[in-house]
Amino acid sequence: PSALARFNPDGSLEVWLPNQAPDMFRTDIAKRTGLDPAQITVHSPLLGGFFGRHFLYDSASPYPQAIALAKAVGRPVKLIWSREEEFLRDVLRPVAAVHFRGALGNDGWPVAIEAISATEGPTEAIAGKQGEKLDPSALEGLAGKSYAIANKRIAQRYVKGPAMLGYWRSVGNSLNDFFYESFLDELADKGGKDPFELRLHLLRDNPRLTTLL
């Protein structure tokens, strides 16, 4: 992570920083400096990848330090964090424990599935959600599956974790798909089915996905 800050002779401020939401960052910089947003220019370098990393996380960006240093020394400051500092201060992926239950018909095919995720989700970290803490992104990979299972229940139980979370690439899918597919393998074993044949059966009305398989 890096940032460059420069105060101009007219009192305006220019900041160069990788980001996914320039207006959001400019508003935050205005709060930190007391400047009018019209005095602040945020330059968004067209380089690298974002992958959910460059949002407005509380401790995971060096631009507040670059601005403070530029103001203190009266000259432009470019700040680059070491890899050690980046990993110490950065956000993490969502973490969850998911409890699954399922039911099989007399023919061994799944007829019901329940997945309850004990997790926080990253939306609270970026948006400061108040009151309602449920986060749809935390259930990605559990909800919205194409498998033709007649009875489904997908739920989140809010559990606050010790670390600040962020929207790293694929968010909920990065863990929940593994959980869900592993449980399907268990259902296949319990029902005496081949895991591949079970998936073909559950996707039998979806030619696109059966072709993909």
Q: What function would you assign to each model-found segment?
A:
Residues 1-3, 95-182:
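Glycine-rich loop/linker segments at domain edges
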Residues 3-73, 126, 130-142, 167-207, ...:
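Alpha-helical support elements that line or immediately flank enzyme active sites
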Residues 16-18, 43-45, 80-82, 105, ...:
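Generic beta-strand/beta-sheet core signal
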Residues 24, 86-89, 120-124:
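Short, well-ordered, mixed-charge alpha-helical segments that flank or form enzyme active sites
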Residues 30, 57, 93-94, 150:
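Short, glycine/charged-enriched secondary-structure capping and boundary segments
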Residues 47, 84-86, 120, 205:
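Residue-level marker for beta-strand->alpha-helix junctions and adjacent short loops that shape enzyme
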Residues 75-81, 110-112, 195-199:
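Acidic/polar loop patches that form or flank catalytic/metal-binding clefts of enzymes
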Residues 77-100:
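Structured beta-strand/loop patches that form or line metal/cofactor-binding pockets in enzymes
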